[in-house]
Amino acid sequence: MSIIINGKKTANDLCEELSKKIDILKKEYNVFPCLKVILVGSNPASQVYVRNKQRKAESIGISSETIVLPDSISEDELIEKVNTLNEDSSVHGILVQLPLPKHISASRIINTVSVEKDVDGFHDENVGRLVKGEKNCLIPCTPKGSLHLIKSVENNLSGKNAVIIGRSNIVGKPMFHLLLQENCTVTILHSQSRDLADYCSKADIVVAAVGKPNFVQPDWIKKGAIVIDVGINSINIGNQSKLVGDVDFEGVKEKVKAITPVPGGVGPMTIAFLMINTLVAACLQKGVDPSDFIA
């Protein structure tokens, strides 16, 4: 019988444990983790994401504030705001919510955030540390959360064939390096790839992050595979909208060893690992070994 991986419960369990660690950090080390989120403009989806992040942070003892800026702000003004937070020693994590307005370079803003406070893990230096397999670096939250879900089903991934569909800097590429570090044989598929079904049919692990509803078909997936669906797409059925992933969940779920649902799979894990990254960042900035708090 297939396992429907409950990302919401796993994330809640992680955050419950994290809350206890934060209490210890405050009482024994006098470290009070603080996360600042910058939201530029009034994108409704971004507002929801930011609100969820702030609520979760506050619920586990992380001080959190959302700084809302107009979408007319210039790139230089935004950089100045980020630098103010960089210089504030009471702030341990800085997150600039993406996407940004078209007149602002996301790459430039991401790389303005201090490496030590880059809780998204998007800074070029943190990307390099991930590629090199360094310990205690800040790793993008969605891939890290996805790996945790995979290992909750199959702890030893050595020698497994893994396929990632999607090559974004946020999910696909960091996921590649995380699975490589687990000694998987990893293939990335993308919009120019041929024979996607053939590659997927040989995979023990499939991570779908392509942003196309129900893109991955049942006959692509081999029996007993682990499928992680990172996609979140809104489709209209009749007069109602429904959230679905990149995988044909109903068609795939009966043949796999395990699969994440949408919603309730990877999404909550992204927020949980943002909280973990904030704790790691606070520890590193205050000279505390994060491994004392994070397994």
Curated annotation (Swiss-Prot):
Domain of life: Bacteria
Amino acids binding NADP(+): G166, R167, S168, S191, I232
Molecular function as annotated in GO: methenyltetrahydrofolate cyclohydrolase activity; methylenetetrahydrofolate dehydrogenase (NADP+) activity
KW Secreted (keyword) present: no
Database matches in SUPFAM superfamilies: Aminoacid dehydrogenase-like, N-terminal domain, NAD(P)-binding Rossmann-fold domains
InterPro entries: Aminoacid_DH-like_N_sf, NAD(P)-bd_dom_sf, THF_DH/CycHdrlase, THF_DH/CycHdrlase_cat_dom, THF_DH/CycHdrlase_CS, THF_DH/CycHdrlase_NAD-bd_dom
Pfam families attached to this UniProt entry: THF_DHG_CYH (PF00763), THF_DHG_CYH_C (PF02882)
Annotated catalysed reactions: (6R)-5,10-methylene-5,6,7,8-tetrahydrofolate + NADP(+) = (6R)-5,10-methenyltetrahydrofolate + NADPH; (6R)-5,10-methenyltetrahydrofolate + H2O = (6R)-10-formyltetrahydrofolate + H(+)
Pathway: One-carbon metabolism; tetrahydrofolate interconversion
EC number of the protein: 1.5.1.5, 3.5.4.9
GO CC entries: cytosol
Assigned keywords, A-Z: Amino-acid biosynthesis, Histidine biosynthesis, Hydrolase, Methionine biosynthesis, Multifunctional enzyme, NADP, One-carbon metabolism, Oxidoreductase, Purine biosynthesis
Record keyword tRNA-binding present: no
GO biological process assignments: L-histidine biosynthetic process; methionine biosynthetic process; purine nucleotide biosynthetic process; tetrahydrofolate interconversion
UniProt function note: Catalyzes the oxidation of 5,10-methylenetetrahydrofolate to 5,10-methenyltetrahydrofolate and then the hydrolysis of 5,10-methenyltetrahydrofolate to 10-formyltetrahydrofolate.
Record-linked HAMAP family: THF_DHG_CYH
Similarity comment: family membership: Belongs to the tetrahydrofolate dehydrogenase/cyclohydrolase family.
Subunit composition and interactions: Homodimer.
Name of the protein described by the UniProt record: Bifunctional protein FolD
Native organism: Wolbachia pipientis subsp. Culex pipiens (strain wPip)
Lineage, opening ranks: Bacteria, Pseudomonadati, Pseudomonadota, Alphaproteobacteria, Rickettsiales
